[in-house]
Amino acid sequence: MSKPLLDKTLFKKTLDVVGVRVEAKKIGRVVKKLHGHLLNLPRLRNVVPDPTNPDPYKNSSSKLILLNSKVKDMETLQPLNEDLVAFLKEESLAFVSHAIELDYSYFAVDQVLSELLPKGMDIPSSFETVGHIAHLNLRDNQLPFKNVIGQVILDKNAQIRTVVNKTDNIETKFRTFPMEVLAGDDDMEVEVHESKASFRFNYAEVYWNSRLQQEHLRIIRQIKPHDVVCDMMCGIGPFAVPVALNGSKVYANDLNPRSYHYLKENIALNKVEKLVTAYNLDGRDFLAKLLSEKKQFTQVLMNLPAIALEFLDAFPGQFDHWEGELPFVHCYCFSNADDVKQDVKQRAEKIMGGELDPERTSFHLVRDVAPKKVMVCISFQLPESIAFSSERQASKQDDPKRRKVAAENAA
């Protein structure tokens, strides 16, 4: 099968319609009478200058009111009803043939591609937008036509300068993926705006998903200015920077050196240097560093759904020095189980070696990522039985104040 050429002359078409020549002062009344019978096509006006006027684009004495394509005969004006035809003739209005010239620029993406792609092939008219980049995930049968698809999307979206296609799955430890430029500039440096923050980054070097904007906002709204946030897998800062803009202190970490680079750039860009401290460590090492330095935090974010659950093994028995309430943890993961909540809860408990308190555990289904596979956020307050070592738990049991409270409760 040969791939199609983008021949824009294929889309030159003439649309012949009936026009009603009307004096300018009568236009409003006649348009109202013709409601339901007017030309109704995207981006086309149904009241246009009268081409018979010497200078039709200036205030002239007449205009053309264009009827929809069902009205073909200027003599009978069918399917207009008799009363409407009588009204038009009583007004002594003239009926003329009017040609509308259409070309490639008029037609939408799906209309163009439906002409260029084989019959029955899905039209890839939806895509993720990241700054000036359109990101496609083309199917195998669409790949022979990838360049023409890219060119059409580029032509039809004024804000797009680059069209890329993912060529393989996300399999790197930094969650980046291989891509190829289908059309436009080979420019991966983008700037996006989200949650009242600005972010700059190279789309080929870091992970960014515009479809997670609402999920970012959901968590950001939960975090209050008095909170201190430990963001273990922060990327370029979609959580860290906005919560800092809201007044929270943040310890933000990412293993990818390029994410770390852009994280620091975005911290400076948004002027939150005094509130965000950036780290470039493995997530477990980062948590251990904060705990060894006796840093206190109230919220922990773990946004690496492919493996974040595994990092919960860094929590058990590491909080013996802790003062006050233990932090809340928000951990993202994938699940393909029938009972998603039970599956995620059991996996988290198995990794941490203890049970979560049902009263302090909640779940949020973020989005479907594949058939029978969902992205989930489990949120829970870290239980004492997991956070503290057996020695710390034993010492708490022997605490005189705790024994007194227990005795009073038993009385």
UniProtKB/Swiss-Prot annotation:
Its main location: mitochondrion. Residues 391-411 are annotated as: Disordered. S-adenosyl-L-methionine binds at H216, D254, L255, D282, G283, N303. It catalyses: guanosine(37) in tRNA + S-adenosyl-L-methionine = N(1)-methylguanosine(37) in tRNA + S-adenosyl-L-homocysteine + H(+). InterPro entries: MeTrfase_TRM5/TYW2, SAM-dependent_MTases_sf, TRM5-TYW2-like_MTfase, TRM5/TYW2-like_N, tRNA_Gua_MeTrfase_euk. Keywords: Cytoplasm, Methyltransferase, Mitochondrion, Nucleus, S-adenosyl-L-methionine, Transferase, tRNA processing. GO terms for cellular component: mitochondrial matrix; nucleus. GO terms for biological process: tRNA N1-guanine methylation. One of its GO terms (molecular function) is tRNA (guanine(37)-N1)-methyltransferase activity. The keyword DNA repair does not apply. It is found in: Mitochondrion matrix; Nucleus; Cytoplasm. It comes from the Eukaryota. It is an enzyme of class 2 (transferase). Its EC number is 2.1.1.228. Pfam families: TRM5-TYW2_MTfase, TYW2_N_2. The keyword Methyltransferase applies. Monomer. Belongs to the class I-like SAM-binding methyltransferase superfamily. TRM5/TYW2 family. Specifically methylates the N1 position of guanosine-37 in various cytoplasmic and mitochondrial tRNAs. Methylation is not dependent on the nature of the nucleoside 5' of the target nucleoside. This is the first step in the biosynthesis of wybutosine (yW), a modified base adjacent to the anticodon of tRNAs and required for accurate decoding. This is tRNA (guanine(37)-N(1))-methyltransferase. It comes from Phytophthora infestans (strain T30-4) (Potato late blight agent).
